[in-house]
């Protein structure tokens, strides 16, 4: 009896051992399959950046993890990297890497002329128009569509270049005009003094305004002050002689009867003197000489600056001459009363 249980125990042990072995073998086969399925996933992590356009590689990876055999639409290729190691990547069979490159479409002159005419008419040709145009030119609709896309891109680039060129040309023209104006302003001489002078510019006034110099300015200042004092004295002198001498220089400038003051004034003034701005020339000469003597011009200044300053002083003295005459009269009256 004890032998039978021993045989049964051996059988049970053998059955359990066989079950264990089969279970271990099944587990090992599963681990091997899992390792085979996870191996391409590790390899696909790096090259997916280079082949990001093939979205079917993810499907291949999923199907590979589920089954040990590759699906029909996936294939394996071996790639050697820069370090020399060989890597296995899975790519979809639809991605034909061995196919030749697409040849560029060559249009005839007639086709280009017709396409250009249609583009000038309308930049977007779609629908029946594109179908009819492709049929007439013996082209495909895709070729016509791509040609119009390229033509629109070229036009945009040309317009951008033209706008940049126009801006550069306008800036250059503006700069040149500004430089030309500055050059003209630098070379422009001050306004001519002979145009401002009366016909009697050959007298003492013209010589004083044309050729300024320090000794001449000093002499003119002395003569002007003496003439102004004499004119004031003649204006304040009582009697018909004073009245005649007061109005006589403004009319003709000829010497008339009166005291020595007016006679000396007419002797020092030119015989043919004309009025400027309805004012007597001797009084104008005196005011100009006094203003020039109050602020003498230096010889170190440029000739253009001196002429411009002289013209400005000449105009200012002419404008304010009546006020200076009244001031001289008031001063002379005060001196006479004292």
Curated annotation (Swiss-Prot):
- GO biological process entries: astrocyte differentiation; axon guidance; brain development; camera-type eye development; central nervous system development; glial cell differentiation; negative regulation of neuroblast proliferation; negative regulation of transcription by RNA polymerase II
Question: Keyword DNA repair: yes or no?
Answer: no
User: In the record, what terms sit under GO molecular function?
Assistant: chromatin DNA binding; DNA-binding transcription factor activity; DNA-binding transcription repressor activity, RNA polymerase II-specific; RNA polymerase II intronic transcription regulatory region sequence-specific DNA binding
Ranges annotated as spanning the membrane: none
Q: Which SUPFAM superfamilies match?
A: Homeodomain-like
Which residue intervals make up region (Disordered)?
A: 1-69, 239-269, 318-338
Bridged cysteine pairs (disulfide): none
Q: Which residues bind DNA?
A: 100-159
Keyword entries, A-Z? Developmental protein, DNA-binding, Homeobox, Nucleus, Transcription, Transcription regulation
Give the top-rank taxon of the lineage listed in the UniProt record for this protein.
Answer: Eukaryota
Compositional bias segments (type: Low complexity) = 239-252
Q: So what does this one do? A: Transcription factor that may function in dorsoventral specification of the forebrain. Required for axon guidance and major tract formation in the developing forebrain. May contribute to the differentiation of the neuroretina, pigmented epithelium and optic stalk.
Q: Which family does it belong to?
A: Belongs to the EMX homeobox family.
In Swiss-Prot or TrEMBL terms, this protein is called: Ventral anterior homeobox 1
